[in-house]
Amino acid sequence: MQPYLQLASLRLATTIPLAPRLYDANLLAASGAAMASSMAYIALLCAALAAVVALLRWAYRWSHPRSNGRLPPGSLGLPVIGETLQFFAPNPTCDLSPFVKERIKRYGSIFKTSVVGRPVVVSADPEMNYYVFQQEGKLFESWYPDTFTEIFGRDNVGSLHGFMYKYLKTLVLRLYGQENLKSVLLAETDAACRGSLASWASQPSVELKEGISTMIFDLTAKKLIGYDPSKPSQVNLRKNFGAFICGLISFPLNIPGTAYHECMEGRKNAMKVLRGMMKERMAEPERPCEDFFDHVIQELRREKPLLTETIALDLMFVLLFASFETTALALTIGVKLLTENPKVVDALREEHEAIIRNRKDPNSGVTWAEYKSMTFTSQVIMEIVRLANIVPGIFRKALQDVEIKGYTIPAGWGIMVCPPAVHLNPEIYEDPLAFNPWRWQGKPEITGGTKHFMAFGGGLRFCVGTDLSKVLMATFIHSLVTKYSWRTVKGGNIVRTPGLSFPDGFHIQLFPKN
């Protein structure tokens, strides 16, 4: 028994100390794990802190950009987004957008902002605007935000400079210059306006914006590319441009369901049609030039062509868009303004009925001499485009640091010349929101951009289609006021986002005059 007790005592003596040792080991292991966890937490906290500091520094640098001089006042908004959301906010009036108006009131006529990720100086100052246009190619160059470049193509005429831009401008003037207007386009526009108005008068009503857009598109697309809507390969071209236009000036979010995505899809499909037409033309034997596309194909076939296929396609796309959309919008808002101002319609009828009375054949078309005699009509057109403000901004980019009006515009920054801010300035135009064509009475015809009138641009890039646009508007007004009366059926409300649109259309009914 004794040995057993001794053995038991020995076992007890050797086993009892094991428990504290195991406890200590577990404690050490737990402490190590806790320490490792704490270290990981501290590391994570430091990383988060570093990220926050980096983010704050980035945000500070965004809102306080480096400059070699005094920047214009204003805010660049949130990083990357900037003030893009405010810029695209809808405005249901003809007045200056709240985005520009509020900032002019707060900062003055020159201020900085950020739109679609780029710092931009906005100018509502006539002197600065004129200076920017006059210094193109020296201190500034034509520029549009990346999203606009994606829409119109990276090789579109607005993105080209120097010799290539001048060459393309000369090419376009073959079609839209005064000689071709006198000899060909005046008669064709007059016939198109007569035919369309007669067709609309036979219908219960017409959605005017869509009707005018189709009329001008059919006319100009035929002159540009020999457009034939009866051909299966071309039947959807007008529809594709319609989709493109719906999202043209919208928030640049390219995901399905957004207006911008619809715009990009419209461009892609329109370019597919144009590319197919180009391949067909290139495969055909050489022929005399019948339309503008033939001139382009002729250039592409040269041994050392100045054009590339990409530049040619982007050029055709931009010309098709510019040829019909802006004029269609101006004419639509013009008819709306005439509807609201019957005294102006009476004065127009007086001028145009006098023209008809002086004709040998009352049913003959408008001649060039008659067109040039439409003095009051010219005043009406000037007033329409002043109030329409189809183009909310004209963009340029500083090629170097530019000192102007006590401010420094850093190299690489964008400049947005704001025509509406000038056209609606009460210090320049008395009662600027009033439709008053007589304000232009006795003033010389404007043939280029001025400090106080930029509806057709300014400087070297004054719109080459200005004369065609004026001819279209004048011949349309001539047939409208001499052959018809009309009434509004529904719609007519406008929205600027910031581009002009008629969200519920503008439906009118035409009544032929006896």
Swiss-Prot record:
Induction: Transiently induced by auxin and light in dark-grown coleoptiles. GO terms for molecular function: heme binding; iron ion binding; monooxygenase activity; oxidoreductase activity, acting on paired donors, with incorporation or reduction of molecular oxygen. Heme binds at C463. Pfam families: p450. Keywords: Cytoplasmic vesicle, Heme, Iron, Membrane, Metal-binding, Monooxygenase, Oxidoreductase, Transmembrane, Transmembrane helix. SUPFAM superfamilies: Cytochrome P450. GO terms for cellular component: cytoplasmic vesicle membrane. Its main location: membrane. Not induced by auxin in the Yin-Yang mutant, characterized by an elevated growth response of the coleoptile to auxin. This is Cytochrome P450 87A3. It comes from Oryza sativa subsp. japonica.
